[in-house]
């Protein structure tokens, strides 16, 4: 079971990998390919601390602005990326042992918070409860709707609408995307 989730940016994740804190026994990194050397170094350091680390490279692009971007289908989050993340998490969610999960992306705002919501929903929380929890651990959360759309399809539960509705209520101009 996943007990606690920590959301960080890449810099804080690197500090954790180099540090002596061993609170988190599983870690997911979702970053751009340009950060590959940092992530591979982190993986080695986390492994030496006994942390199971998984990483996925894709850009933090979403389709929530209502514009069709050709690069989304090659560089943005893909269904296979989200499937891989869910498949990585499943044994830890189903395990009777208590696990603490760390998640990072470059800024700790979009990809990582979406993954945190996915992990929380997999543990039995509703999407609303999951997002509420993630906002307490990462107040600047702005989850990637494309990732949540794919997760909704895989988990057969709507993770996207709660966050999409929340984004609509935020201060004017921050989210100007179209919803279809």
Task: Indicate where each model-derived feature is located.
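Helix-loop module immediately N-terminal to the HCX5R catalytic loop
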Residues: 50-102
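Glycine-rich, flexible N-terminal cofactor/catalytic loop recognition
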Residues: 1-56
């Amino acid at each position: 079971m996943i007990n606690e989730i920590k959301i960080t940016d890449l810099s804080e994740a690197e500090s954790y990998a180099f540090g002596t804190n061993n609170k988190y026994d599983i870690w997911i990194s979702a970053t751009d390919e340009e950060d590959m050397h940092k992530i591979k170094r982190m993986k080695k350091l986390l492994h030496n601390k006994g942390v199971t680390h998984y990483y996925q490279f894709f850009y933090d692009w979403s389709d929530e602005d209502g514009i069709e971007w050709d690069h989304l289908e090659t560089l943005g989050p893909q269904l296979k990326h989200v499937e891989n993340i869910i498949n990585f998490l499943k044994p830890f969610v189903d395990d009777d042992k208590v696990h603490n999960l760390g998640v990072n992306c470059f800024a700790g705002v979009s990809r990582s918070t979406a993954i945190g919501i996915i992990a929380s929903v997999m543990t039995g929380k509703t999407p609303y409860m999951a997002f509420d929890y993630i906002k307490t651990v990462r107040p600047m959360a702005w989850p990637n709707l494309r990732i949540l759309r794919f997760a909704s399809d895989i988990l057969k539960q709507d993770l996207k609408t709660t966050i999409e509705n929340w984004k609509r209520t935020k201060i004017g101009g921050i989210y100007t995307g179209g919803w279809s």
